[in-house]
Amino acid sequence: MKREEIKVSVLRVGGTNCDAETKRAFEELGVQAEILHANELVRRGNLLEYHVLVFPGGFSYGDYVRAGAIWAKWIMAKLGEELKAFVNENRFTLGICNGFQVLVEAGFLPGFDGVSPYPEAVLATNFPPGYNCRWIHLKHENRGKCAFTWKIPHGKVLRLPVAHSEGRFMFAKEKEKEFLKRLCDNDQLVFRYCDRNGEYAEGRFPTNPNGSFYDIAGICNPEGNIFGLMPHPERAFYWWQQPDWTRQKQMLQYGDGKLIFESIIEYLVEKF
Amino acid sequence: MSISLYIRRKTFPLFEVNVLGASDQQLLEISRELGVGLNLQEMNRVQEFFRRKGRNPTDVELQTIGQTWSEHCFHKTFKGVIKFDGEEIDSLFRTYIAKATNDLKPRWCFSIFEDNAGIIRFDKSYGVAVKVETHNHPSAVEPFGGAATGVGGVIRDVLGVWADPIACMDVLGFGPLNFDYEKLPPGVKHPKYVYMGVVAGIGSYGNNMGIPTVNGAIYFDESYVGNVVVYCGCVGLLPLKKFRRNAKPEDIIVLAGGRTGCDGIHGVTFASAVLTEKSEEVSRPAVQIANPIEEEKLKRAIIRIRDLELASAITDLGGGGLSSAVGETAKRFGCGAVVELDKVPLKYPGLAPWEIYVSESQERMLLAVPPENLQKVLEVFRSEDVEANAIGKYISDEVLKVYYQGEKVAEIEIPFLFEPPKVVRTAEYKSKVFEEPTFEEPKNLTDTLLQLLASPNIASKESVVRTYDHEVKGNTLLKPLQGESAGPNDAAVLKPLDDSWKGLAISCGMNPNYGKIDTYWMAASAIDEAIRNNVAVGGRRIALLDNFTWGSPEKPEVLSSLVRACKACYDFATAFKTPFISGKDSLYNESPLGTVTPTLLITALGIIPDVRLVVSMDVKEVGDLIYVVGRTYNELGGSEYYRLKGFVGNTVPKVRAKEALKIFKAITRAIDLGLVKACHDLSEGGLGVAAAEMAFAGGYGMELYLQKVPVENLNRNDFVLFSESNSRFLVEVSEKAKEEFEALLRGLAYSEIGKIAKTPSLCVYGLSGDVVVDASLNDLLACWKRTFSSEV
């Protein structure tokens, strides 16, 4: 498939607010990206025209109950069947921050046995509590399953910003061990919070900014075509978005966030 | 209510108010009972007007007049006459603020003092709109809601000139967080409660709307215990050719956004009154309820309508609700308006017509739409899930007609509505003399520096800043916090356009403590600080905003301090060639604990031609030279150092504009030539604090020699280190750029005062060559971070 043929839909509803910069990141890499109101997608009924579907960051519908829960219920009610078909056709879905919360609430992630009718995990209130906007480090854990990171070397440390108040990834206590094993066995673990040297945070704040179980920052489904993460790759795309660019002697062309967008595009280019 | 004064007119709640037959005393009673806040002179004008009409006003009419003539909406004090020092000042606004801009006549000003936000040119096609609001009164009564709606309101001000909001900034003032509960008068909330609520409210609105909060400050003062200070600012971007302001008769009035309810009734009269013990009970309904997601949707729809060029005018609904938005639009375009109140969608039934007309429910905008575009406009709103309704139209007669259930409930001529009697006030200046402190110079200043770093006005506000999303939209190029240690950058820089390297620098300046001595030099210092913060990162072509928080202008002494601050605004805006482009005043900040310390916030907006040259404040490389630029004077009055010692003092820092302007230009030039590796302005805590911040932000130590600092009339280490003289910078320059840099500064006060050291500590040698400060970066940083590490 040619790069310029790739079509990305960046979805939005009331309260979505990271759509423009997400679209910009895709466009910078030469693919077609379009911001689409979810109402419009329902009206058009053309989801399958797109290769990549993105749930961007924001506060969908105000997140007045658990973050992402309202949009998740909305999307399953209005587009559930189409979305399942989209996933089953091996198209690609990305959830960033609020989008990750939506994918978890909708049962797409971790999706151990396909789309779950109820959430199998949760992105709970941060610990320590409160909204937190800062740059953190992530270690790439995936061994090649995730289409959004397959180009990133295993073990590479990336630097991206987080900005959320509900990002603590958790399983139900009694299933923690079992589910973690499945995540690892299925190669669903994608990013874990670590320090700049790649040492895992082990839950320590602020290296792990939200108290996530096992320092989990991002996971994919068993097939590797649905990926969600709390940090914002679209805010770490250009060199000048990095917090310490004024200290760099040699300007890098891009930030680490680009690796994620590039991976999925190259996946499509090379494998389709 | 006294029956004889009010006659119920209809089956719905509409009252005729017996103004014609009322005595002066009864007029005041009416004003008080209806909560319209009009004084006798104004009530007499109303009486005279309705006598000519030969009928009594309805409550809708009286309320409309009350809202329009309120201090909040009409700025009576700034537009009135002030007798001061033998002269008569006809309008502070025209005489000082607007005059500075008119004298300078910058070509890059696009629309100034015309709408709710000022617009300047950013480049050939784009303009930048900016506005800073005060939301002190609501935040005192309900901190979370007051602050959140303050942010919501200022974002709508920017939307109200067709600009897409791209950044917010917030400057806050609180009482000391450890204020004694025993001393708290009834009705005044504890500073800590106010602090937590206000910070959460601001974060919640900005984050939910997806607008980065990029700049701000938090200041503590005893007088803020009873009068919290909440300044909310917003910057927006608009393609200038899409700017529409040409409403005409027959255009439809479209009300869009949230529904109208009982929240925010009489917000403006409340904001123009003194806070009392009863404010909670009486004024709680005056605070609106925030729903940022509604505004987010509204924003999307409005930007689409702008781009499709479907509407002829727009304004936001803020203070005074519909009554002021409709009236002001009609006035602006020289027409009248017909409004049908039953077309206004309500949150719940049961509102009286006057309540619908003056309610300040949030997240609402008012558009003027040519009839042929109405359906398209409504369709855009519908597609964004935003409610919108045609509620009336503009007409050629300059009269306002309001209907409810087919009955006319108000008819007032527009010119009358905008000609309230001119307020005449008297100002009287009494210069203040504080004890000039005499204390011995401490031998070792390490502890003093550590204490200063931990003092509330200097200590790190990281725990607050991180609760605001400063990265959303992905265009924040220089962030509020710099480096791993989160050092305080002087200004935020945005890169608003994808295909351009042009940047926007946003900074602020505020020095309430100097105002205790003299508001003239306080204003001058705030202007200098805002500008030098902007210059420090590479900003130029600077525009200013003024925001006043003052006490009751009816007190001659308070008023004189306002006049003096305004004079300084004129003097220094013209001297620095930095026009005012917008502003706002909040007066009557009085509580049972007394008058607020006069607090002038100056916001500066600069342009950076190429953001790749932007400079941050953290030191970069061992061996580089450290320069101080600007002279240090014996000016410690109002300084943080004196405060630490328990004094105010009299020697308030002055601004020497001619010298300052040369320094600013030289710094700008040096940045453009790439000679500056780090730059930090010297403000609270002076040289000592600035050096410490630069050092721990960069992770390298410094060795400095006070002997080399250019001073005048100073022979004490502590004064050289902590004086807060204006127009000074600390600059890092590499050895090889030394000559070129010094050539640029020739003739100015500057000196190479030391080096960046490998040892991670700040070492300062005193005037006689001995070590006066020797502190590890870890200790400096720990003290700076400790104060607010767990407040939020």
What annotation goes with each model-predicted range?
Chain B
Residues 2-792:
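Glycine/proline-enriched, intrinsically flexible loops and inter-domain linkers
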